[in-house]
Design a protein with these regions (language model features):
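Cytosolic juxtamembrane N-terminal segment immediately preceding the first transmembrane helix
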Residues: 2-36
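Extracytoplasmic
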Residues: 22-56
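Residue-level signature of mid-helix packing/kink "hotspots" within the transmembrane helices
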Residues: 39, 67-75, 125, 159-160
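Helix-breaking motifs and short loop linkers at transmembrane-helix boundaries and internal kinks
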Residues: 53, 85, 106-112, 123, ...
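Conserved MFS/SLC helix-loop-helix module at the cytosolic interface between two early adjacent transmembrane helices
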Residues: 72-111
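Cytoplasmic helix-loop-helix junction between adjacent transmembrane helices
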Residues: 116-155
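Helix-loop-helix hairpin linking two adjacent transmembrane segments in secondary transporters
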Residues: 151-200
């Protein structure tokens, strides 16, 4: 029997293209950027605490601000990605959190640092759900598990290497410039993503 229109459309959506490899590379780089930006503050905390004369409790609030925002905004951002597509949402949220990564380096007291990290967490919250949706559109089911493993491994590798990178950078530049430098990496990624990626194969 001849396939109906719905079957043909489904087959076309499931037909893999080589472009998915480029999507995979971009998302793996994004995984690394997410952990680079979120983990770096742990190594930079002593420098920040010394400059602002913060207590350990205050620094704990700064860490918690990120986690709270991440928890609150993850589901709403994922729903937004389902509605408008991941091309727009990932570009926007990566720009958002990159700006607030840089804003962390421009903080001038405890409150400004707290706000910057909260808004940074709000941006990062939607990254992984949006990437999962991207995989669902671009990657065949039989390859998604493998790609997810690369994605997670890249994130955790970046998390492991970030303290080493940050320690080395602190010998050259200030803690403030480290945040600005890391924020710029996200802006570059967002530009490439928004210019190249499309929501559907």
């Amino acid at each position: 029997p001849m396939p109906n229109k719905t079957q043909s459309q489904t087959a076309e959506l499931e037909k893999p293209t080589r472009v998915r490899y480029k999507v995979a590379v971009l998302t793996v780089f994004l995984a690394m950027i997410t952990y680079l930006d979120r983990v770096c503050i742990a190594t930079l905390a002593p420098n920040i605490m010394a400059e602002f004369t913060l207590t350990k409790v205050q620094m704990g609030y700064v860490f918690s601000a990120f986690a709270l925002a991440y928890a609150v905004f993850e589901i709403p951002t994922a729903r937004y990605a389902d509605r408008i597509g991941t091309r727009a949402i990932l570009a926007r949220i990566v720009i958002w959190w990159s700006v607030f990564t840089m804003a962390t380096g421009m903080a001038f007291n405890f409150v400004s640092l707290l706000v910057a990290r909260f808004l940074f967490g709000a941006g990062e919250a939607g990254a992984w759900p949006s990437v999962a949706r991207t995989f669902g559109r671009w990657v065949p089911k039989k390859e998604r598990g493998t790609l997810q493993s690369f994605f997670f491994s890249a994130a955790f590798l970046a998390g492991a290497l970030t303290p080493v990178i940050v320690t080395w950078l602190l010998g050259i530049i200030s803690w403030r410039i480290v945040f600005i430098l890391f924020g710029c990496s996200g802006l570059v990624w967002a530009l490439i993503w928004s210019l190249w990626f499309r929501n559907e194969p």
